[in-house]
Regions:
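Short, glycine/charge-rich flexible loops or terminal/linker lids adjacent to PRPP-binding catalytic cores
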Residues: 35-85, 92-95
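A phosphate-binding catalytic loop at a beta-strand-loop-alpha-helix junction
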Residues: 91-100, 104
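Conserved acidic residues
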Residues: 22-23, 82, 112
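Hydrophobic Val/Ile/Leu positions in short beta-strands of Rossmann-like dinucleotide-binding domains
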Residues: 27, 86-87
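Active-site-facing substrate-recognition patch
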Residues: 1-21, 164-171
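Short, highly selective alpha-helical patches that border small-molecule cofactor pockets
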Residues: 5, 9, 31, 35-39, ...
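Short glycine-rich phosphate-binding loop at a beta-alpha junction
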Residues: 19-31
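PRPP-dependent phosphoribosyltransferase catalytic core
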Residues: 101-171
Length: 171
């Protein structure tokens, strides 16, 4: 729903300093609606953009067969030499965020940071992560590799899985 997307964008915008320059928001994990509201909120808040038209690009990448993040030729000018923010639904292990960072660096972008609805970490390899919700909000939150799940090893069934699509009960 758009109301919640707008509220998430408003919460995230309040976490950035007004001298932060954002030219492009790279939306991961289906966050395009939030990204559009975030671009609007940044513009309304007086945040800077070096784009000639003074608006912020909102784009999404593709994944190739090796799960690498790529951008098509028409999107590369929106990354190269641009101040880029990564927007994610959740950051748990940092693997997807790391792939996004590598891709933006490969295409010549200037990484400004990452934003997420939920993040289990505050930063990844020096990249700050601003999130609406974090481990302080879910103190019992844990992540386990599927090969090393303590509940599975104890013979207990998992109640649910959480991924970018949401909460999925394991009925």
């Amino acid at each position: 729903r758009t109301k919640e997307a707008e509220e998430v964008a408003q919460a995230l915008v309040g976490m950035y300093l007004y001298d932060t320059v954002i030219d492009t928001i790279v939306c991961m994990e289906g966050t395009e609606v939030i990204g559009a509201f975030l671009a609007e909120e940044l513009a309304k808040g007086g945040f800077l953009s070096t784009n000639a038209h003074k608006s912020i690009y909102v784009i999404s990448p593709e994944f190739n067969n090796n799960s690498q993040i790529i951008f098509r030729d028409n999107l590369i000018p929106m990354i190269r030499d641009k101040h880029v923010m990564i927007l994610m639904a959740s950051v748990t292990t940092g693997r997807t965020l790391n792939k996004a960072v590598e891709s933006i660096q490969y295409y010549g972008g200037i990484l400004q940071g990452a934003s997420a609805i939920f993040s289990a970490m505050d930063s990844l390899d020096g990249v700050p992560i601003k999130s609406v919700f974090g481990k302080k909000d879910l103190p019992d939150y844990t992540y386990s590799d599927y090969r090393d799940c303590p509940l599975c090893k104890a013979g207990k069934k998992i109640d649910a899985l959480v991924n970018t699509f949401g909460y999925s009960p394991m009925g």
